[in-house]
Amino acid sequence: MHRIKSKAIKNFLFIFFLIFGHPVYANCNFNTSEYITELQNPKNITKIDITIPDSKKWNKNLLKITLDRSSNINPKYRDKFNSNLKVFYKFGSCSYNARVRISGDWKDHIEFNNGSFKASLDVKLFEGNILNAVRFKLLIPKTRNSINEVIGSLIMREFQIISPETFMTNVSVNNSSSTYIFQENSAKEMLERNLKREGPIFEGNEDLLWSYKDFEIMQLEDISLSRLVNDSWAKKGLTSTLISLNSFIELQKIYLQYQNHEKRSSNQFLDK
């Protein structure tokens, strides 16, 4: 009986977050209240269409990145562009105002085929959400080992490990169509979808890997630890600050222990 009540409460909270977490859908040509369950299933998305009005400036920016001598994407080219985004479902469509920029660190996030650019995107919706995500990435599949990224996410979910919503979908950017990986950002919406309370979210800090000119790329990997993604939550109050700080310290210790273990294992192998 206790398990049944617990499951019922979790289901209620899940639906509550989906409906009231933020304005659920922007401008849709169907009654969203009749499709609440279907709108949370990525299988019902048939296509995402993105139009960047200032397409000339967008393409010029991608060209600059391509011609830049550096092997990684210089932060100065991460300009944000207003866009119109439309999601097509099996039962209708929804339109959003959004902002996009190029995603990724390396130039493999840009392709040029048949006279047009294709790039991985960071997307932010100004209103509503898609599968409860306000911020998400549309990634060129090869940058994440293609379908393996989706499979990995599904496996983690089976083991009840929090993982972002990840799936393949058709995307058109300024009338250039291709297959992309949709992946929600690590944010409070991801925690809500996994029925978790909002808290600190950490990810590997890659800035040290290629942001310092005096060092070779990846030379500082041993001291590249973690960083707090949602620092705004940590600033909400003393309790959230202490939780974030203590979690940050513990995670850094784990990173350092791992690096030390790897070094010892490598040295033992070389000694043999």
How would you name each of these model-derived features?
Residues 26-97:
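Regulatory N- and C-terminal appendages and interdomain linkers associated
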Residues 34, 147, 151, 167, ...:
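Extracytoplasmic/secreted proteins, especially bacterial periplasmic and envelope-associated proteins
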Residues 24, 158, 167-168, 268-270:
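Composition- and surface-driven signal marking solvent-exposed, interaction-prone regions
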